[in-house]
Amino acid sequence: MTTSKPRKPSKAKAAKAAKAAKAALEKISKPLSKTPPPFRNHIIDKKALKNLVAWSFKHHGTAVTSSMADDLKDLGFKYATQAAVSISVDDLKVPAAKKDLLGQAEEQITATEERYRLGEITEVERHTKVIDTWTETNERLVDAVKKNFDENAPLNSVWMMANSGARGNMSQVRQLVGMRGLMANPQGEIIDLPIRTNFREGLTVTEYVISSYGARKGLVDTALRTADSGYLTRRLVDVAQDVIVREDDCGTMRHIVVEAEDSKFAKRLVGRLTAAQVVSAEGEVLAERDTEIDPALSSKIEKAGITAVSIRSPLTCEANRSVCRKCYGWALAHNELVDLGEAVGIIAAQSIGEPGTQLTMRTFHTGGVSTAESGVVRSKVAGDVEFGSKARVRPYRTPHGVEAQQAEVDFTLTIKPSGKGRPQKIDITLGSLLFVDNGQAIESDVTVVQIAAGAVQKSVEKATKDVICDLAGQVHYEDKIQPREVTDRQGNITLKAQRLGRMWVLAGDVYNLPPNALPVVDGKSTVTEGQVLAEASQRSEFGGDVRLRDSIGDSREVQIVTTAMTLKDFKLLEESNHSGELWNLEAKDGTRYRLNTIPGSKIGNGEVIAELADDRFRTGTGGLVKFAPGLAIKKARSAKNGYEVNKGGTLLWVPQETHEINKDISLLMITDGQWIEAGTEVVKDIFSQTAGVVTVTQKNDILREIIVRGGDLRLISDNKALERFEGDGQMVNPGDDVAKGVSVDTMKFVQTVETPEGKGLLLRPVEEYTIPNEAQLPELSHLKQANGPHLGIKATQRLAFKDNELIKSVEGVELLKTQLLLETFDTTPQMTVDVERAPDKRAKTISRLRLVILESILVRRDTMSDSSHGSTHTDLQVEDGISVKAGDVVATTQILCKQEGVVQLPEATEAEPVRRLIVERPEDTTTISTSGKPSVAVGDRVVDGDLLASGQPSDCCGEVEAVDGSSVTLRLGRPYMVSPDSLLHVRDGDLVQRGDGLALLVFERQKTGDIVQGLPRIEELLEARRPRDSAILCRKPGTVEIKQGEDDDSLSVNVIESDDAIGEYPILLGRNVMVNDGQQVTAGELLTDGPINPHELLECFFEDFRSRKPLMDAAQEAIANLQHRLVTEVQNVYKSQGVSIDDKHIEVIVRQMTSKVRVEDAGDTTLLPGELIELRQVEDTNQAMAITGGAPSEFTPVLLGITKASLNTDSFISAASFQETTRVLTEAAIEGKSDWLRGLKENVIIGRLIPAGTGFSGFEEELQKEAGPHPDILSEDPAGYRRMQNLRPDYTVDMPPAASSSALLADPSDADLEATRTRHNIDPSASTNAAFTRPDVDNELKEEQVVDAEAVEGLQEEGLLSDD
């Protein structure tokens, strides 16, 4: 510290000071010199760095840590600069072991393929084995990569970065220098062709394409993920936003138990408070109730071997609508007990929502089950295997197709050595797989058993895979498949295999026969190349004239004209105008018909061919249609084509002009009711066509329509007459009186109108149109065939409008149309009529319209291309222009044999004619000569390696066709293994082509983590979705009894409960039972596999506890069990993706989901049945009932998903701002709800301070407690919140340090007092003024002090003293 003018000290003083300083320095540095800082010579990687920073933060606080982190950063950069770690292609060193590893994998896979080819394993087993082999190889390769770098290049830059955790990870290094590995296709199934190369060696084209599948998937995933994750966070924030720490201690005795995983608690206890004493096995008390558990205490508890600790948790906190400090524990931001007013709900929501982006969306289905060689025990000695007397085993086939035995009970297996030595004992657990038989002699180091890990029954799903045929031929089953017919609910018959067995396809050349082809050769006959095997013919159905069209592509069209009709009375004329060509029909009398169809098009029955262009029925403007009595129309389904006239008569037409405007009213240029002349501008740029009275229709200052009605306007005062014609108006016949002195001589339509001059009658002219009974048309001929379809034309009159219809239009309309319609009889629905233009037979210049019905026959050209059809040869049997009768052959097609051989025909039945035939060619058989007498018989089927004679194995697969003394003739074939319950697509003896499906294998594969993983799984849990096909849960505890149903498929599980009642649970097909006979089960336990329905689980728990406990306790325990389940499930998803979230965050959210109950029976309370209400509220209500003696309410706990919970909060403002705004606000308004503004969201929306942090109302009590002599400074605050800035500037309130939340209010300093005195002109020397002198310790005034009235007034003005 320096002063402005240092004085020179005396020498003695200086010496003394120096000595003292030296002593002080020694005093400080002595401990340092004795204990030098620990020198640790370790590699500091990412993990060690993490721990170092955490330790520093805990012991030395933020400032020291941040400066240390800075120093570390500088250090790192300094050495990184000097080391210059770079990466180049040469750094990617592929381990030499890769070649051998891939070689081994290839060998295993070749062996598997060979087993598949010989029909020893099914397609599924082959696929599973291939994938597992590659997965294992990949893992071994990663180890080789690590070993290679570690031993040969520990300072390799790639390895250093990945190994220290600075950048990249092992899976990326694996792809750079190991192998890229297996990829999934877009459906999520793994492709069994792995990418063997790495990026260093480069990918082949095929590998590149497969590789880009995965990359695309990743990109799409990321895009979807961000959106989903954001929405999840929003819902979480909404459900938890009002959870604020409002109390210090709720005093609850309830708690949750945290159990150690593998005798470790990791971080699960840190930051929690104990709910009871923690006592070690020796009886030593490690912690009292309400002790904060820090890492040291946590590891102490672990070391003491304690496996379960009771801690306080937000789940069991009894604070009303909030959480208390002790139940919440540490705020993880600064590792100290959470402060009052901390918005822990929002923190929880963000903590769970934020890692959402790191979770994957969808997972891959691995083909089959990834059976890592887990728990495999090998023999240590050579000897004989003994199972022992207790052993029970059943045959089992592993997913890789290895025959083994599965243990049904726990027992001990012994291997008795053949020589000296101790026997090897292996403990076999239920469900383990044994690869040896009882009494079998084995060598040492042989796989004996695979021990089942934990629960055997995993969640599995049914999946299917097709077996595709590799060669054409004939199918034969082995007897042991035992196919049986199964009829499903729809009545479809399918064939199912009952046992494991082979299906053989014996080779041959299979010919597909076209429809209607018949074989012309007999079975077992020998055919030569080019011989006709079958013949098909195409026939005409109706007969007629043949037209041959030019061929298109590989087929020719033969058209047979069945019926034709030419309209002789009409000329066909063509006109063209700007919109294209128009065709007209002109009759002899000159009337013209407009053609609706152009020549070359097709039309169907009942369609309009032409319309009469008739101006007699055209009006000048729009108007009103009235039918005179006698005119009748047919009812039409739609008015699109108008209404057909039944009976002629008179049609009356009242013209009026209607302008549809839809413009602003300011453009109107006339007034309503005014009489205007033709040509008047009614609206800007719109002119009236006729004269008459104007009616203006408007709505909301928008002009809709302007109607001009012409006629004779008479202003009269006869009220009776005016009333008579009010509204729609009436028709008046000639000679009738309309009003006094007004009569009409022609028919008029009379209406009352209001004009600016007053009321009057408008006599509107009526036009009459006479409509004939029949359409006037020239004679039209019907054309009939002796048999088959025939044609006709009929004329109809159609009115466009019905009686009393108003036509709003300025232009005129056509009232009546005369149409020519096509009529066809005896046609099939597919038949259409072609419209053609034909020259007249006599005068070539005149064209006529011709209607034709054609039968079209497509004739295939000769094809060589389609191998399965053999070569076909087609002959046309007709020529152009000749006439054929119905049933005549038009073309024949022959199927020719491609290669000599022996024909075999399958059995033909009435229902199923022969569709295929097979020719057994010379190359489909092989003859093997044997040295001795063959040991096989005709009809035996052999595979590679089977003995044909002693010491002579077969080198191919097939069926023995002939045997003589020294040779065996085999018909080549291929076996396919079929697993039980597979669907067989073909029957014994069927012929198949290469590529046909033979069977559908049904197999079970393990569900990869419920398939749903990551975000969708989190969402499913937090929204409490009811899963499809959920598992069957046990309702009451008891003993299991498994029963077979009527047929061997169906099972039922009975649970014998404690009171000997029997709970029956029928099990659906395809469900796996997860319990064993005689097993004890508890409520809520799974009886079958499948996802759990959380709502059902809660019901099971509640029913079970309700039978033994009071309602309140039952509800709390049921909820507690479910809460524990939910927290664990959510944690599991995040853990599986490597994200760590503290339990307490999830607990806060789950607490909000389980806080409500549904009232079932209100009792004497004011609650409503069906109402959702907080458990605490019901508890209070029921306690009040217990005191007054009323009937308490009955309720059941409910689980709400986060969306539902958000919409069911007490605050309607918060709910409405979340979703379904209108519904929430409407309901709140109807119920007259009040919002108490307890949460953060409501206050933000209203615009007040949020009740968290310093705005939290709990602060005021703290302040009041500490305000000491000046309680009034806190009194006047309109907002009801104690804001810091509201305290007067003369006083300072120190914000409490984070550790304790007690507020301190310092007394005013001398300077402050001085300032206030000066402001109020108070004489400082007058010691009697109590207001500005300091009170004594007890806030009592000394006797000599008197209160100065002026000073008090001044203080009251300042608001520093209350009026009391």
UniProtKB/Swiss-Prot annotation:
Its cofactor is Zn(2+). GO terms for molecular function: DNA binding; DNA-directed RNA polymerase activity; zinc ion binding. GO terms for cellular component: DNA-directed RNA polymerase complex. SUPFAM superfamilies: beta and beta-prime subunits of DNA dependent RNA-polymerase (SSF64484). Residues 1318-1342 are annotated as: Disordered. Pfam families: RNA_pol_Rpb1_3 (PF04983), RNA_pol_Rpb1_4 (PF05000), RNA_pol_Rpb1_5 (PF04998). Keywords: DNA-directed RNA polymerase, Metal-binding, Nucleotidyltransferase, Transcription, Transferase, Zinc. Its EC number is 2.7.7.6. Zn(2+) binds at C250, C317, C324, C327. Coiled coil: none annotated. It catalyses: RNA(n) + a ribonucleoside 5'-triphosphate = RNA(n+1) + diphosphate. The keyword Transferase applies. GO terms for biological process: DNA-templated transcription. The keyword Flavoprotein does not apply. Binds 1 Zn(2+) ion per subunit. It is an enzyme of class 2 (transferase). DNA-dependent RNA polymerase catalyzes the transcription of DNA into RNA using the four ribonucleoside triphosphates as substrates. NCBIfam families: PRK02597.1, rpoC2_cyan. Belongs to the RNA polymerase beta' chain family. RpoC2 subfamily. In cyanobacteria the RNAP catalytic core is composed of 2 alpha, 1 beta, 1 beta', 1 gamma and 1 omega subunit. When a sigma factor is associated with the core the holoenzyme is formed, which can initiate transcription. This is DNA-directed RNA polymerase subunit beta'. It comes from Synechococcus sp. (strain CC9902).
